[in-house]
Each structure stands twice: as C-alpha cells, then as structure tokens.
C-alpha cells in the first residue's frame, strides 16, 4: 500500500462488523486490518444485495495485543485512519478503548457499532485518554446473523428500509458542527461507494434525529426479544398469548418510552404506545418465520448476545435522568442468568438441546455398539469355527501319531526278531564249531607236567558265551544276517541286545561280564603256575646240587611281572620285560616236568581260548642215584639275572618230585582286567619281537643235545625255541583248538647233562604218582624269601662260569656253590 492508502481497522465479533469488513476489503486503496476471536482468516457471508462472498483477510489478528506487536515490528506507521469497533459488554468496551491509545491520534475517526444500542459515544470518550478524538456511531436495520463458524447471512425483511445510519448522538444540541458535518459528508461518500444498493442516511446532520433513530431500532430489541427467551418462544406472534408476558410487556414499554422522551428523542405515533410497537414488531418477522436475531443467537449459540450493552446501558441512562426502571432491571437479571445457563456455566440447569445432543450421541453410541456387537458375534463365530478346525486337526494329528507309533513298534519288533534270529544263528554256528573234550580220558592225564589240570567242573560255565578270539588255523564262517556284520559274534550279541532288549539283555551282559572276570582270573592263575613251573625247571637245570627242601614263602609279584602276565593273555601286546628269576620270590614248587626229545619247544603267543581252575598235579617218582648223577628238584640258578628261555629244555636229573606244602594264591591278581577293545573279535598275542623278552632268547650253544624241545603249557599257549635262528616262529602244525576246550599234551625233554639219550615218558602210569593230599594254605601276608634276595644280589660271573662248564665239557662245581665259595674266600 502507498502512503495515500486509507488505513482501516475493524474490531469485534458483532455480525455487522464482518458485514462492513466484507465491503471494505474490496476497496483497492484501503489497508484493512481485522481483529476478532476467530482463529481463521477465511470468512463467508451471504447478503440479498451482494450475494455470497468468501474472502480471506491478510491482516487478521485475534487480539489487540497481537496487532500492536505486529505493527511495532513493521517500519510503517501504526496509526489508523478509521476504526470500526464493537464489544459484548460495557466493561470490555472501556478496556478496548483504552488499548487503542497507541494506534490512534487526533485524526483517527472511531465508529461504534450501535445497532440496537443507545448513546455509547460518551462512554468510549471517557475511557480514552484523547478526549478530542472524533467518535461516531454506525447503525443499520439490516438483519445480519452468524449461522456458523466464520459464516454469516443476511435475513431480509419487508418492513425494514435496509439503511445505514451515520451520526453522533447528543442530547444537548440539535445540529452538528461544521467540522462534523464535513467529516460525515466524506464518510457518506465513502460508504456509498462501498455499500451500493444500500441507503446511507446522515439524519439531516441532527443529533436529535440520530438519537431518535437509535431508539426506534432499540425499543423492540429491549422490550420484546428478551421476553421470547424468557418464555422459551421463537415466534413473536406467540408472545402475547403468555398471560405473564403482558404485564412485563406493559411495564417495559412504559419505562423505555419514558427514558427515550426524557433524553429528547422524537418518537412518531407508531412507536409511542404499546400496541403499535407490538404490532410493528410482529409484522417485521411475519414474512420470514424466523425468530429475532437475539433469540436466534441464543438458540444456536453462535455469537454473544450483548445483553450488557443492550439492557445495562439503558438502565444507566435512566439512572442518569432519575428514572426508575424495575422491569428493565428484572429483565436484565433474568437474561444474565439465562445467558449463563446457555453457556453451560449453571450448576443446576442445562439446555434441552444439550440433552437432545446427549441422547443423539447416546443413540449414535448405541448404534456403534450394536455394530461392534455384531462384529464381535461374527468374530466369535469365526473363533469357534477355527477352534473346531483346530480340534479336528489335533485329532487327525493324534491319529497319525498313533499310526506312526504302531508302525514304529512293529518295525522295532521285526528288527528285534531279526536280530534275535541272527544272534541265535550265530550262537548255533559257534556251538557247532566248538569241539568237546573227550570224556573217556584216563585219570592219569588229568595232571600233566605243565601243571594245568582239566577242570571239568567249570567246563559248562566256560562254554557259555565266551570267546577269546578266532583260531589261528581255522575260523568259523561268517553268519549271514540282515543287520550289519560285526567283528565278532560276542560284540554283535552285546551291542544288539544292549540296544533293543532292555532289562533282559542287561542281565545277560552282566552275567557275561562276570563270566569274563572269572575266566580272566583263571587264566592269570594258570599263567602264574606255568611261570613258576618254568622257573622251577630252569632253577633245577642250572643248579645240580643236592636237592633241598624249599621253604615255601609267599610269592611277591611285582608290577612288571603282572604286566608280563597280562601280555600272555594278549591284551598288552608283546612282553616288555624278560621273565627272569629276579622278578620273582623264592620258587614255591619242586615239581619236575618230564621232557620229550621228539617234540621241539615252540611258543606261539596266541590268545588262550579256555581257562581252567588250577589243581594239584602228579609228582613223578624216579629212583635215586648217586650224588653225581642225581638231579635236584631245585632250580639251577647259575646267576639270577641269566634266567631266560634257553633253560626251558633242561630237565632235572632227579625224577622224583616233591609236592607243594602250600600253594600261595594271595598274590594272584583278582582284578578285572578286561581287554581295552571288547569289540575286537581276535585277541591273539602278537609275536614278540623285543630282544629283551625272555621267550625270544635261544638256548646256549653249549648244550649236548641240540634237538629242539617243545612244551605245550595250555591249549592256547605254545613256546617254540630254536637254537639256530634266534627267533620265535609260529608252529605250522598247531592243532585246531577250540575256544572252549582244554587239551593237555605230553611234554618231553631231552637230557642235556647226561650222555645217554634216554627219555622219560611222563604219561606212563608207572612214572606218575597219584596226587598228594596235602592241604593248600596261604599266609595272609606275602614275604620276601632269601632265595629272591640272593637272586637279586647275584653277580654276572655266575653265567660265565656256567658257560665255561658247558664249553669245556668238564664237570665243574655248580655256579651257586662257586659263588658262595668265592664269597667265603
């Protein structure tokens, strides 16, 4: 806008203010500002003359404070040329006038919206600090109402002139001053341009006529419109039917006419009596069938009622002239309370339309509830349907699960039957391959030179589910089964029944383990007796002294001997230490084993197939000879460290045998020495390759007879010694010995000390004495014998002396006595 533009400010919520604003915003040379409670700057108005107009105000503010703040931020002037204002109450009007001080000056022209109000100009001047400011009033008979938020409408009436009045209401003078007339003339031209088709009336530049026009517009609004609200009537023609309304109408009309005439207003005949006023008021709304603007705004609550300015200002004016107005005061009090009720501030009363709204809201909520209930019912039906489907699926799943379980059980039963059949076939094949021992063996063969008895009383127990490995010559054919082939029938039996047969298989496995333990103990005992017999024989061969009665101490077995004993079973591989006399205590047996020169010694270290219980063996009676040719039943120990496998073929000279007075069994290891891998089907002892092993040593080359000797210790152990190639070979002529039989073979030895090649057959009944009846007893604690200590302290020179005796062919003193003579010297 240029500096020549007219700055106009419109303030208030009165519908007439917006009507004026709608016309001013069309002018191009007017800088328009608007202030009201609406937060929106878009407005819409419908009039009979200008039609429907929708516009947006650029400079719209919600309060004077916001306006002054915005103006102060701009560099332009903050003073307005024209201000059109209204207020809902006298107090707010005074406050608004005081706030305008910063945006007005002496040239500012203020127009008060006074349609239906009386003489507000002096009240505004008193509130302003500038008493010389020109304050005018503007009023119109146009019925402009607010029908909605920021929406206004013109309600036409045939009884009205549709005129805008400009002027100043004063009761002291009749004519305006020349300056006021000039200003009013200028504004008349301005409004005439802006409000075309509407009359602009200056009331002949007379303040009395302008005051009279104010009263004409205000009498019906003061006397009749509030009574419609009080009696809850919308149609003006129904007010006179109320009996109580007639005295109120009479009293109010009388008081208003009195005050108007007292102030100098000139009322015509149509406005100076009660009947004419009431008739004119009814006719003004007869064609529209609409209530008056005050009643309309009260019902729709769209805009303030302005009760304070309408009634209280009249009461104050009457009081200024000393006129009593009890009806008017009563009406003001009642309408003030009704306005509080209408705004919802009452404690006891509410509007019926609020109840209607509540009922409508309740009905709407009920409809929503019914819709939601229907939806809930539908969802519940879906839920029940889904539950039924879920139950059907669960039943079907259960049936399928039961079918699968039955199929699985049938498969397990079939598998168990197949495994049991395979196991029975395997057991049958094993029993078919197991030879039985001849029952008609003579009693003389029950005790062999090896010291291993035939234990027939535990034969059945040993035959029950015991397997120590396949025979080195012949093995059973493989068993065809539906299950994967195992390494051995025993491991297949243990694994298959352990997985499928439950408690019965566990009991069977425990029984097998017990049998294995007992069998291993018997094997260890057998090997211990074999070692003792070997040591005794070697001791007798190395020492040709006078036989002496041995003291029978307990055999103290060391850890290395136990490991050698386990090596004989094939669990630990080859024997790691030589079986020398230094590893044992004093020999406890004086039995002499016969020899057979035709049977060479051999030692295939195989896994023993059957263990038997140790029993006393027969002693062989040989006639005593001279001291020189008599054989001692004591072991020939030239040097305890020189005891080796080369002395196994040396038989004693004395054929007489002495039985043990006591047989030590306390030192025999009874622990469970199970093999490290039970699933292996062969437990054969690998061939000993350790050069320190006693069984790998060959006999001394100084022996008179080089015929190899063979001694069978048990059905599964055979020692073969060759003098030519210094190694142990597996005999190719080994018999096919079953795992569950104990075979005793005759053992023959060649006499290496005598020149004669006579042999003694120990199987001859003439040379076998019956077994002694000596009771076997063992001391509670093992003790070391003197011969064991002597064997540990022997020097290597003994072996040298013995070798010299063999090489020279000259009979020399025994190494044992020679060592003692040297020590005496």
Swiss-Prot record:
The modification Phosphothreonine is found at residues 496, 739, 756. Disulfide bonds: none annotated. It is found in: Cytoplasm; Bud; Bud neck; Cytoplasm, Cell cortex. Keywords: Coiled coil, Cytoplasm, Phosphoprotein. Residues 472-503, 538-664, 750-825 are annotated as: Disordered. The modification Phosphoserine is found at residues 471, 551, 662, 757. Residues 490-503, 553-566, 631-645, 652-664, 789-798 have a biased composition (Polar residues). One of its GO terms (cellular component) is cellular bud tip. Residues 809-825 have a biased composition (Basic residues). It comes from the Eukaryota. GO terms for biological process: endocytosis. InterPro entries: 6-PGluconate_DH-like_C_sf (IPR008927), 6PGD_dom2 (IPR013328), KPA_reductase (IPR013752), KPR-Related (IPR051402). Present with 2180 molecules/cell in log phase SD medium. May have a vacuolar function. PANTHER family: PROBABLE 2-DEHYDROPANTOATE 2-REDUCTASE (PTHR21708), PROTEIN PAM1-RELATED (PTHR21708:SF25). Belongs to the PAM1/SVL3 family. This is Styryl dye vacuolar localization protein 3. It comes from Saccharomyces cerevisiae (strain ATCC 204508 / S288c) (Baker's yeast). The gene is SVL3.
């Amino acid at each position: 806008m240029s500096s020549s533009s007219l700055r106009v400010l419109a303030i208030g919520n009165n519908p007439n203010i917006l009507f004026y604003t709608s016309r001013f915003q069309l002018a191009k040379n007017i800088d328009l500002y608007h202030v009201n409670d609406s937060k929106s700057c878009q407005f819409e108005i419908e009039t009979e003359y200008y039609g429907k107009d929708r516009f947006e105000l650029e400079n719209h503010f919600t309060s004077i404070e916001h306006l002054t703040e915005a103006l102060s931020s701009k560099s332009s002037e903050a003073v307005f040329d024209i201000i059109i204002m209204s207020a809902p109450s006298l107090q707010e009007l005074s406050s608004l006038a005081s706030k305008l001080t910063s945006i007005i000056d002496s040239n500012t022209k203020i127009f008060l919206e006074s349609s239906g109000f009386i003489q507000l100009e002096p009240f505004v001047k008193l509130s302003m600090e500038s008493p010389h400011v020109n304050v005018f009033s503007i009023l119109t008979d146009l019925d402009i109402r607010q029908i909605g938020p920021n929406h206004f409408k013109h309600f036409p009436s045939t009884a009205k002139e549709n005129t805008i009045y400009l002027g100043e209401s004063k009761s002291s003078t009749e004519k305006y001053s020349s300056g006021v007339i000039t200003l009013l003339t200028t504004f008349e031209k301005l409004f005439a341009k802006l409000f075309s088709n509407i009359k602009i009336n200056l009331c002949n530049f007379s303040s009395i006529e302008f005051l009279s026009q104010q009263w004409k517009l205000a009498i019906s609004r003061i006397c009749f419109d509030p009574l419609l609200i009080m009696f809850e009537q919308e149609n003006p023609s129904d007010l006179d039917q109320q009996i109580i309304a007639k005295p109120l109408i009479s009293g109010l009309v009388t008081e208003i006419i009195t005050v108007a005439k007292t102030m100098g207003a000139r009322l015509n005949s149509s406005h100076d009596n009660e009947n004419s006023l009431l008739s004119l008021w009814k006719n003004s709304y007869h064609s529209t069938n609409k209530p008056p603007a005050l009643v309309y705004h009260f019902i729709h609550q769209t805009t303030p009622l302005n009760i304070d300015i309408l009634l209280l200002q009249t009461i104050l004016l009457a009081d200024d002239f000393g006129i009593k107005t009890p009806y008017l005061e009563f009406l003001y009090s009642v309408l003030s309370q009704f306005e509080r009720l209408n705004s919802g501030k009452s404690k006891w009363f509410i509007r019926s339309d609020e109840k209607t709204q509540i009922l409508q809201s309740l009905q709407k909520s009920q409809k929503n509830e019914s819709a939601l209930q229907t939806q809930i019912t539908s969802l519940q039906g879906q839920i029940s349907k889904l539950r039924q489907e879920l139950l059907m699926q669960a039943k079907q799943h259960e049936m399928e699960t039961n079918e699968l379980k039955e199929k699985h059980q049938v498969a397990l039963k079939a598998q168990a039957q197949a495994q049991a059949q395979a196991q029975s076939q395997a057991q049958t094949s094993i029993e078919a391959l197991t030879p039985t021992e001849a029952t008609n063996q003579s009693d003389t063969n029950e005790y062999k030179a090896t010291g291993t008895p035939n234990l027939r009383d535990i034969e059945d127990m040993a035959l029950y589910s015991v397997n120590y490995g396949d025979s080195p010559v012949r093995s059973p054919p493989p068993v065809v089964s539906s299950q994967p082939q195992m390494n051995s029938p025993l491991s297949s039996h243990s694994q298959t029944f352990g997985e499928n047969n439950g408690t019965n298989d566990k009991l069977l496995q425990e029984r097998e383990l017990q049998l294995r333990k007992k069998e291993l103990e018997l094997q260890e005992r057998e090997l211990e007796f074999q070692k003792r017999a070997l040591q005794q024989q070697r001791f007798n061969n190395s020492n040709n002294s006078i036989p002496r009665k041995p003291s029978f101490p307990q055999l103290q077995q060391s850890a290395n001997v136990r490991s050698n004993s386990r090596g004989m079973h094939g669990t630990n591989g080859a024997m790691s230490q030589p079986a020398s006399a230094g590893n044992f205590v004093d020999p406890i047996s004086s039995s002499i084993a016969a020899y057979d020169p035709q049977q060479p010694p051999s030692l295939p270290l195989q896994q023993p197939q059957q263990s038997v219980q140790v029993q006393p063996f027969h002693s062989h009676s040989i006639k005593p000879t001279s001291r020189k040719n008599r054989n001692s039943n004591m072991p020939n120990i030239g040097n305890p460290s020189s005891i080796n496998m080369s002395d196994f073929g040396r038989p004693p000279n004395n054929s007489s045998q002495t039985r043990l007075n006591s047989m030590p069994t306390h030192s025999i290891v009874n622990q469970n020495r199970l093999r490290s891998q039970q699933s292996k089907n062969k437990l054969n002892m690998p061939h000993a390759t350790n050069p320190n092993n006693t069984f790998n040593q060959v006999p001394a080359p100084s022996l008179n007879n080089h015929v190899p000797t063979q001694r069978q210790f048990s059905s599964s152990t055979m020692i073969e010694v060759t003098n030519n190639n210094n190694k142990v070979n597996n005999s190719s002529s080994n018999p096919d010995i079953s795992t569950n039989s104990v075979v005793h073979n005759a053992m023959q030895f060649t006499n290496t000390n005598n020149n004669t090649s006579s042999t003694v057959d120990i199987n001859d009944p003439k040379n076998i004495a019956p077994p002694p009846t000596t009771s076997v007893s063992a001391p509670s604690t093992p003790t070391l014998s003197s011969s064991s200590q002597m064997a540990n302290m022997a020097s290597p020179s003994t072996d040298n002396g013995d070798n010299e005796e063999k090489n020279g062919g000259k009979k020399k003193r025994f190494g044992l006595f020679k060592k003692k003579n040297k020590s005496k010297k």
